Amino acid sequence: MRETYWQENEFYQIFWFFGRLSWSPDGKYLAYSDHANLDESATSIFLLSFDSSDIRRLTFPRTSIGDYNPTFSRDGQTLAWNRTSQDETSIYTMALSGGDEQRLISGQQFGWGLAWTPDGRDIVFGKAGWLANAAWLWKISRNGGEPERLQFGQEGVQPSIRGNRLVYSRQMANINIWRRTLNSSDHPSEMLIYSTRMESGPQFSPDGKMVAFESTRSGNYEIWMCRSDGSGLVQVTHFNSMTGTPRWSPDGRQIAFDSRAPGNAAIFVIDAQGGSPRRLTTETSSAVVPSWSRDGRWIYFASDRTGRNEVWKIPSAGGSSAQVTHHSGFAAFESSDGKFLYYAKGASVPGIWRVPTSGGEEVEIIGSLDAGHWGYWAAVENGIYYLDTKAKPAIVFFNTNTRRSTRVFDLENRPATQAPGLTISPDKKTILYTQLDALSREIMLVENFR
């Protein structure tokens, strides 16, 4: 027998990315993560009663990503969940009988699954970067305190405990940067920048001779650089923290990037020849995914200081920030003539939008860019190259003059998500893009877990 407890139009993105359902031990309730409405970028935790079909909103996060991974305690009296912003992920608990939220721990890596121990005293959780790279299992008391890294659980996420048995998923993702010659069927795609870890966020220098990118080959996300043929690898940053999204200045002398090294995500600028990074944003709110104005005077970035992600800009020499978008905005680039700002809206809203740099109303230009691929596009003189995943994932060119789209080529493997993934060479002859070339998963069992 099947019963419908809510209709399709009553929820928004319950199964997207971090979607997880959790049954209460007595089977009367279901906890899940969803958007309260389409105007809220952050997800919240909701509780569905199977007896009354009533839905109760439990959390009201003021972060750009929100709450997910709800997990009932063994006695059903307490709910634990993750809360994530651009800066950090925290573990929270709440007594379902009433009371305030309690934050147990926060950190720069993302939460990948929660599991209560049988006695209800501790919570086991996975901690990792995007796509669960550099993961490990940890344990923390339900009252907070210092977490304990378990002796097992390397590359471990999504733990589950039943009795004295613990199972978890061990996952390894391999993302590499590929190169392809445009407008030529004689040159197939080839792997350009690769390792056994994560290589993403490529961007050509203005003269096309160098490529800046982000990599985890050192153990953490850092900025790296190489020649356009993939040779001459050099590590640019050494923050030992989540650092990425490199963007060249128009004159090629500087690189802007974001880093969580200060505790909250901030925008930095470093000389392309090396040296000490200069912090540009100083607010306590997050600042991520920078890009330069065509004249080099401004750096655009995304910030959640208003309660959701919007595009802001700050003088490249330093100074006060000014808000640019007002209806949500994230990864942004100016048009080649500097008249328009193109932008995607981040993790929860699909499409590419445009607003005049002199001010005005926003207009949706492309609707078929998935929300999870906010960094998989590049603006050129007469259009935009972007990833279309409606059928087989492919790179498509949208001509802004004719408003027509042309399929350029199909991807060999799955595209990477939640990361910048595409750049076009200055001479428009070459495209670099990221692919998820390998994703291995194993189910691991630990006996006699205490």
Residues of each region from the PLM?
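Solenoidal tandem-repeat scaffolds enriched in leucines and small polar residues
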Residues: 16, 23, 33-43, 48, ...
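Structural motif
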Residues: 40-46, 87-92, 132-138, 174-179, ...
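Blade-level signature of beta-propeller repeat domains, shared across WD40, Kelch, NHL, RCC1
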Residues: 420-450
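Residue position within the beta-strands of beta-propeller blades
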Residues: 29-33, 78-82, 122-126, 166-169, ...
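Conserved beta-strand position repeated across blades of beta-propeller domains
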Residues: 22, 71, 115, 160, ...
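Loop/turn-rich, solvent-exposed surfaces of beta-rich toroidal or solenoidal domains
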Residues: 376-396
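Residue-level detector of Asp-centered blade-edge/turn motifs that repeat once per structural unit
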Residues: 25-26, 74-75, 118-119, 161-163, ...
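Multi-bladed beta-propeller domains
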Residues: 1-17, 47-68, 83-84, 93-112, ...
